[in-house]
Every structure is written in C-alpha cells, then in structure tokens.
Amino acid sequence: MANIVSRTDAEAIIREQVVSTIFQDAPKQSVFMSMAKKLPNMTSNQTRIRVLDFLPTAYWVNGDTGMKQTSRQAWDNVYLNAAELAVIVPISEAVLSDAEFDIFGEITPRVNEAIGQRVDAAIIFGNNRPAEWPNDIITMARQAGNNVAVSGTPDYYNLLLGENGVISKIEDDGYMATGALAAMGMRAKLRGIRTTEGIPLFKSDMQGSTQYSLDGAPLHFPQNGAFDANVAQLIVGDFSQAVYAIRQDVTVKILDQGVIQDPVTKEIVYNLAQQDMVALRIVFRMGWALPNPATRMDEDRVGCAFAYLEPTTPATTQTVTST
C-alpha cells in the first residue's frame, strides 16, 4: 500500500492564517449628550442656572381715568450637580508585554462607550441614577401626564402623530419636538404604517435606506444598550430644553502602585507593585438638568418637554422620587 503524508501528519507544522485585526463593532457614544444642550464646563461640583419662574401680565385700562394694575416677574434657581462615573481595569504587566495588540488602546474606547451607556440609562430611564441628580426624563414626563398607553390593537400613526399622541403631548405644554429616540423594534412598526391605499408612510421603496423622522424631528435608534424597551417604545421631546455640563472630562491614568480593594468586602484584591500589575483608571464627572422655565403655554411649570409611548405591556414597578 502506498504511503502519503496526510494533513493529519503535517498538522503540527501547518500555520493557520491569523487576521491582524480584531473583529468588533464601532464603540457607541451617548445619544443624550449628542442631542441635549451643552453648557460651559463646570468649575465646581455644583452649577447654578437662573430660570424664569413667573411671567408678568398686562391689563386693559378701563376708560380715560382707569387705574393701571401692577404685575411682577420672578426667577428661580436650578442646580446641576456633578456625579462621577469611574472604573479601574487591572492587568498583569506580563500580559501587556506579551499581547499582540495595544490592550489599553483597545480598552479605552470601550470604557468610553460604557460611560455613554450609563449616562443615557440614568438620565433617560433612571437606571442606577446618582442621588445627586434630578428625576429621569421618563419619570418627569409621566408626572406631567405625557405618557401614552398602547391599546390591544395599536394604531401607531395616531399614537405618534394624532390627537393625544406623544407629539401632541409636548405641543400642549408649549414645546416643539426636536428629536426622538426609539427601541430598535419600533423600526418594524414604523415600516408597517400604511395609508388607506396600503402605501407605506415611512418607506418609499424596498432598496433605499430610510431616514426616519416624526413631524420633521429626526428619530434615532440607540445602539449602546441604554434604551429600555420595557419602559418605553419611543421618547420624543425638545432636547434643547435639557442641559448638561461636564465637570471632569474623561481622564485616563495608569496606576502601577497601590492596592485595589473589593468595593463590598473592602478586602485587598490586588497589590499592583507586589504582583507586577498595572491598572487603567478612567474617571468622568458631569451634571444635567431639565430647567422647565415658565412659558405662556405653561406658566405654572407643571408641563414637560418630553413624552413617551408606553410598551404594549407597560412596566408596573417603577421607583419614583419626587423633588
């Protein structure tokens, strides 16, 4: 029988091709920070902004000698309190030395992505909201009555654009929509909205990409994992009314001395010097607010610049803190 050097025989000396890149998606940034109004950087842990609180009025004078009435105007203070996001990523110096890629260069963009996710989740939905911050956008919209329930057989056109729809909620409070956020599942619902003749409203053809918008306001579908579809299907609002300021921009520091403790037990987990380790420490501090100034359509400041569409099965367990 003739012999042959088979692939199995030579497997130890066959080199597989290794692609010199890491297959991964591009890091996602904070959607809220890209749409809200950015104020000058904070110079301390608290920033005070003045907000119009009471509007003056005018009166008709009765006759030639009628008495003119008086009025007043008042202002209020709204505070932005800085909260801190931080993380420490420890790593062995030997691993750093042996790695084919720049590990710190790979980690830093993903930590920035995580910061954006945490910011969006806390501000919009109140998830892990810092105690220093005001209520989240969903809570404030619900307290203002700007939540729209979904029936068993929903008509999404009316829920979004009709009377008592999400856009009309903020319009009744005197605001115009500048943007909207929605869960990824809303794309299919929008593509399914049709005229009485069966023509899709949000899709002109099957080949071209669709630019989603609601009444002229661009509609975004966050992909950073912050949008909670169990709380809302869609959020619309005047994002220029929401403000934020940065106290400390993303700061990266490499530590090679000291110890790292478990946050719960306080036990020492790593001793950097003793174990030949380094740690990447990243810190970010910011504050935000929804000042809600008095307007002619909302003189009592009880309205809200945001509204949201509830999911088909709305969340029933939500923690609300009134301030």
Predicted regions located by residue number:
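Assembly/oligomerization interface modules of large self-assembling protein complexes
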Residues: 2-87
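Protruding loop/beta-arch "assembly-hinge" segments enriched in small, turn-prone residues
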Residues: 2-21, 27-34, 38-39, 270-323
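Alpha-helical scaffold segments that mediate packing/assembly in large oligomeric complexes
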Residues: 76-79, 84-87, 91-170, 308-323
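Extended oligomerization regions of viral-like shell subunits
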Residues: 43, 140-278, 284, 318-322
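Short loop/turn segments at secondary-structure transitions that flank enzyme active sites
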Residues: 55-58, 86, 95, 117, ...
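Structured loops at beta-to-helix junctions and adjacent beta-edge loops in soluble globular domains
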Residues: 50-53, 92, 183-185, 222, ...
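Short intrinsically disordered coil segments
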Residues: 63-68, 103-108, 196-197, 294-305, ...
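Generic recognition of stable, solvent-exposed alpha-helical segments in well-folded globular domains
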Residues: 14-17, 44, 102, 106-110, ...
